[in-house]
Amino acid sequence: EEDIIITTKNGKVRGMNLPVLGGTVTAFLGIPYAQPPLGRLRFKKPQSLTKWSNIWNATKYANSCYQNTDQSFPGFLGSEMWNPNTELSEDCLYLNVWIPAPKPKNATVMIWIYGGGFQTGTSSLPVYDGKFLARVERVIVVSMNYRVGALGFLALSENPEAPGNMGLFDQQLALQWVQKNIAAFGGNPRSVTLFGESAGAASVSLHLLSPRSQPLFTRAILQSGSSNAPWAVTSLYEARNRTLTLAKRMGCSRDNETEMIKCLRDKDPQEILLNEVFVVPYDTLLSVNFGPTVDGDFLTDMPDTLLQLGQFKRTQILVGVNKDEGTAFLVYGAPGFSKDNNSIITRKEFQEGLKIFFPRVSEFGRESILFHYMDWLDDQRAENYREALDDVVGDYNIICPALEFTRKFSELGNDAFFYYFEHRSTKLPWPEWMGVMHGYEIEFVFGLPLERRVNYTRAEEILSRSIMKRWANFAKYGNPNGTQNNSTRWPVFKSTEQKYLTLNTESPKVYTKLRAQQCRFWTLFFPKVLELTGNIDEAEREWKAGFHRWNNYMMDWKNQFNDYTSKKESCSDF
């Protein structure tokens, strides 16, 4: 009983004991870590918490942060499983802690950061339940809610009323909370590993780049996301435009920043949600309407630049991707794609799809993608275009940036480990053609297949146990290979050989240079195409318009000149 009441720096909290796999885990759900960002604190950095006097009941998940929910496939488990399962509120800055029982001494801590494109997400989803990891690996698991969408990332640079990156400062404050308080829970503040998926992994990699976050953790795990991905960070200019667009849509005057923010602060959060989806003129199906920005405070430069300069925390990282990262985005509106059929698309639909995912790229740029991704040996195969678009979207947005991040990191002599996850869960509600989808390694990391009554296979339970073991080993020792030598050794990823490990229900294998050909295209060739043809369409349109103007001038000039010569002739008659 005494283990479930713990004294934190802000006051006492009461948790609860949960039976897990024949043992016990003590869970503390919904501990506040910041002042609720309400009223005049909306859009501001999180403010630290004052003390409370009685015992805080941390026995149920807190509110989820305000967000738009996914209504694309009502009642369908595949999309609904990611929607918030607690009430939406602006009062949402709470965290959860799972500790093995009896209370450990100096246990390693793993802090989970959820994904959701910086627009959605919550720490209370069943698939993020920390109890299995705590029970099986005897680590302490922590997860926090952070603000998303405009409420978390609206940005007017250097204006403390809405500085941008508020959601990342929320995460950072939760990391500080762990530093100050985790010892009371039996955790070791000097052994803290961040792990996250998608936008959560991009967040983790931003903490690696942010000087203020670096002292607050030890190591990092990035699952299917990184800060150098094309969707992860918005330029200041773009972020400012979106803020102004939002203000305009909501009838707030844009003449004076202070007035504008005051006006936005008075709006109903639901109204902000309805309008924030319209701030990007074209929907790429991967739209991050409001996300991280270079604010000069949390983030001092674009991630690419910081990576290039080697300005990141020197430590070990574990990074990886799934086999079919692109499919999850295609069913949300690429032409010819549906979750209810095989999505065999035509060349024309493939080209239309490219337009959706690369709205600002010239026709020539899109042609270069088609050329590179088409299997010309077998261009009559029905699935070709479907698989090609899956690869294009997955490589460009997830796989190649993650590999590039790992490569840059390892060049400076830091140990990096890379995985390629290729097991399709037998419980996956999405259709077969979608393969090993974005987000579907998470249940294996959190040990959901260990619960007997959930109908995973025995092989999946074994896979999940081995992933948990490797993740926890990495968190404890900076190396996923334990002392026991019965499993395949996971070699270090070096920028030269680029070795990686496959994770599936067979035995893991080591390969080198994942998707080397494709990633060369994205990192080296494609930027050149953009530079040269930048927007060839734009240039061409301007040239044509210019030519028409010139043509008209010429006609005009000719008429004027004829007029002049005829007048001159009539004058010379006198």
From Swiss-Prot:
Cited SUPFAM superfamilies? alpha/beta-Hydrolases
Q: Which GO terms describe its molecular function?
A: acetylcholinesterase activity; cholinesterase activity
Point out the glycosylated residues in this chain: N57, N106, N241, N256, N341, N455, N481, N486
Hey, what tissues is this thing expressed in?
A: Detected in blood plasma (at protein level). Present in most cells except erythrocytes.
Record's subunit section: Homotetramer; disulfide-linked. Dimer of dimers.
Q: Which gene encodes it?
A: BCHE
Gene Ontology terms describing biological process:
acetylcholine catabolic process; choline metabolic process
Species per Swiss-Prot/TrEMBL record: Equus caballus (Horse)
Keyword tRNA processing appears in the UniProt entry: no
Q: Which reaction does it catalyse?
A: an acylcholine + H2O = a carboxylate + choline + H(+)
Q: Which residues carry this modification: Phosphoserine?
A: S198
Xref: InterPro entries = AB_hydrolase_fold, AChE-related_enzymes, AChE_tetra, CarbesteraseB, Carboxylesterase_B_AS, Carboxylesterase_B_CS, Cholinesterase
Q: Which family does it belong to?
A: Belongs to the type-B carboxylesterase/lipase family.
Q: What is this protein called?
A: Cholinesterase
- What keywords tag this UniProt record? Disulfide bond, Glycoprotein, Hydrolase, Phosphoprotein, Secreted, Serine esterase
Q: Which cysteine-cysteine pairs are annotated as disulfide bonds in the entry?
A: C65-C92, C252-C263, C400-C519
The root-end lineage is: Eukaryota, Metazoa, Chordata, Craniata, Vertebrata
What EC designation does it have? 3.1.1.8
Q: Where does substrate bind?
A: G116, G117
Cell location: Secreted
Catalytic site: S198, E325, H438
